[in-house]
Amino acid sequence: MIHFKRSQRKYVKKTYRVLNRHEYEAGLRERGSLTVWISLHDGKLANWDAPRPKKRKPGRQRKYSNHAIETAVTLGMVFGLASRQTEGFICSLFTLLNLNNDVPDHTTISRRKAKLGKVPFYENKQKTPLHILIDSSGLTVHVGQLRKPPKSRHYRKLHLCVDELTGDVVACDLTSKSARDSSRVPSLLKQIDSPISSARADTAYDARGVYEALDNHLAHYSPRVLIPPRKDAQLASTSATTRQRNRNIREQARLGKRKWHTESGYSKRSKVETTFYRYKIILGPAMRARGLASQRVEARIGCKILNTMTELGMPCSEMIG
C-alpha cells in the first residue's frame, strides 16, 4: 500500500476542455504545409540566390543567400530530416515545382549555418508592454564516440524569455551548462526593445543583478518582478533595486509559499515550462549541430519555428474539473 504525505494529497490533476478545437486542428494541419515554410512570389523562389556584391572580394563568391540557407535549416528541423535528407527533399521539391534554382549541398548548409548570426524571430508590432517569463532548460549534444561514457551528461543551456499573453518566444540565448541562469538575464533583455510590465522567474534568478537589469531596462518603466526568494533570504538595505525583493520576502513570509504563488500571480510562470515542452517535443530534445556558433543559430531558428506555429493557432481551454 502506498502512503502519500499530507502535502501531496492537495495536488489533483485538473481536467481541461479545448474551446476552439476546429481552429486549433486547422492550425495543426497548416504546420505541415510547405507554403508556410517556403516563400514563393509569382511561382518563383524569393531571395534564393545571393545578391551580387558591389565590390568583388577575393575568393569564390557566395551562390546562395542567407535566406536560402535559413530555409533549408528550417525545413530540416520542421520535418526532422538529416542534412543529406534535407538536400534530397529540396531537390525533389524543386523538381515538382519546375524550378531551375540550384540546391545547396549538405556541406554548404552546415558551413553557412554557423555564419547566419542573429536570426530575427520575434517582432512586437504593437509595442505594448510585455509580461515576460524567464527560465532555462538543457538540450543534449553529441560528444562523439568515446571509449568510456562521460561521467556527466554533456548539454547546452537554452535560456528563453516568453510573452505570457501570446506564448511567443521574445528572446533566447544558448550557453554552456556551467553558465548561471541569473547571469544571462542582461543578454536576454538586450534583445527586447519593448517596455516590460512584469517579469516572473524561479528561485535560480533570485540575484541582485537580475533586479538591477530589469529595473534599468527602459527609462520610465519599472516592471513588477516576481521571483520567490531563497530559504535563507534576508532583507537588504532599502534602495531602488532591493525594494521589490524585500517586498517578495515579506509577502511570502506573511502568506506562505503556496498562497503567495497564487495571489501574486507567480503561478503563471508555468507557461514557460509549456514552451520548453513544445520545443523538445516538436524539434527534439537534442541539438543537431556540433559547434556552439551553429547551435546558437539552430536555437534561434527553433524559436522562430515555435512562434510561427503559435501564430497559426493555439488551443484555448477552460477547466471543467
Predicted features, each with a name:
Residues 1-58:
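Basic, low-complexity segments
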Residues 28, 173, 316:
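Short, flexible helix/strand-to-coil boundary loops that buttress conserved ligand/catalytic motifs
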Residues 34, 93-96:
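A short structural micro-motif
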Residues 66-78, 257-321:
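Basic, amphipathic alpha-helical segments enriched in Lys/Arg and hydrophobic/aromatic residues
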